[in-house]
């Protein structure tokens, strides 16, 4: 039973860490685009899809897995 709990915990932690890394990449890309505009170059135009992805990265979201509730 303890082994099962340990395995589920590791699975959840690895899954959430992978998602957080993806969110961080979106934020870093946005910072790069802002830096370009500070240099006097035109800032990159964001598509609606990119803007919604950035908004998603900033809003905490519930993660649902069978038998596990995390918010």
Curated annotation (Swiss-Prot):
Tissue: Expressed by the venom gland.
Coarse class of the protein's main subcellular location: secreted
Biased composition (Acidic residues): 22-31
Location of the protein in the cell: Secreted
Keywords attached to this entry: Disulfide bond, Hydrolase, Secreted, Signal, Toxin
Disulfide bonds: 62-71
EC numbers, comma separated: 3.4.-.-
A GO CC annotation given for this chain: extracellular region
Propeptide: 19-45
First-level EC class: hydrolase
Activity regulation as described: Inhibited by tissue-kallikrein inhibitor TKI and trasylol. Plasma kallikrein inhibitor PKSI527 and classical inhibitors of serine-, metallo-, thiol- or aspartate-peptidases evokes a minor inhibition of the peptide digestion.
Stretch forming the signal peptide: 1-18
GO molecular function: hydrolase activity; toxin activity
UniProt-annotated stretches for the region Disordered: 22-54
Coiled-coil residues: none
Family note: Belongs to the natterin family.
Role according to the record: Shows nociceptive, edema-inducing and kininogenase activity with release of kallidin from low molecular weight kininogen. The cleavage occurs at Met-Lys bonds.
Name of the protein in its database record: Natterin-P
Protein species of origin: Thalassophryne nattereri
